[in-house]
Each structure stands twice: as structure tokens, then as C-alpha cells.
Amino acid sequence: TRDPERLISAIVAHADLRSPRLDEVLEAHEAAGRGLLRGIRDALSHAKHPEVLRIPGRAPAGLYADPAFRAGVARLGERGLSYDTWHYHYQNPEMLELARAVPGTTMVLDHFGTPLGVGPYASQRDEIFEQWKLDIAAIAHCENVVAKFGGMAMPPIFATTFSQWAM
């Protein structure tokens, strides 16, 4: 039941999904969240170039394929929690493989797999957008993946403008 006086109705927290202490961390989040924990967000945006947004301490390349990471994502599903992810367009195929490997976990694709349009990608916007559409279409076939429509007004990071979004 939703309490109209409650300001927060759900929490998506952070955890290192590779941690051998993942269950402990999730239990602590659940206790602190007083029943509001719904998922874990772990941004795997791995920037290859300095012109692209880099966040210190972010994920190393190839983390989607890491067996410990995949086990952590699977554990979320077992606990009824979702996995939120944010990454760049060239990581969409890796995320697709993760979604197929862990079908029991609901995954939230943040920022639609961020098709980049800055730095070395600025001159490849059309090609990137075409490949991005193919990748997103493949991801859309995974019943355990939903997309969060957010961050789309962050030009010039994206390879497209809103007028191109009709597919």
C-alpha cells in the first residue's frame, strides 16, 4: 500500500556485484531502506577516450562477462531485486549477452545504452546510430530488460537528436 505522506517509494542502491559479501551488503541496504529497496544500480560505463564522460572508480572493461559479476546479477533476481545499468553504445552487445545469461533478473537499461556523439565518435554519428538501433532492437527481445528513459537531453554526448528517435 502506498502512503501518500511518504516522499520516497523505492530505493535503487549501489553494491559491488562481484563481492563475496554481496548478501550481507544487500541485507544492510534492505534494513536501511526499511522495505523500500527495489534494485541495485552499477554503472558499467567504460570510457575508451578522454573526451567521453569518465567517472573515477568506474567499471573495468569486460565486467559484464565476469563470472562473479554475473553471479551477483543472478543473485539480485533470486532476491526479487532488479539490476540497473548504464553504459555506452559499444557495450550494448556485452549487456545483451548478460541479459541472455541471467534471464531471471529484471534489468533496467539506463539512458538507452548511450549512443555517443562526442570526441572520436562525433564524425561517426550516423554509423553509430544505425548500429545502436540494431543493438537496441536485439536487447528489446530480452523479456527481462526494460529501458529507463532518462538522460536523453544531455547533448552533445548523444549521437542523435530527438528528431531521429522514430524507429
Predicted regions and their residues:
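Mid-domain alpha/beta scaffold segments of enzyme catalytic cores
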Residues: T1-R79, A99-A101, A122-S123, E130, ...
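Catalytic pocket-lining loop regions of alpha/beta-barrel enzymes
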Residues: A61-M167
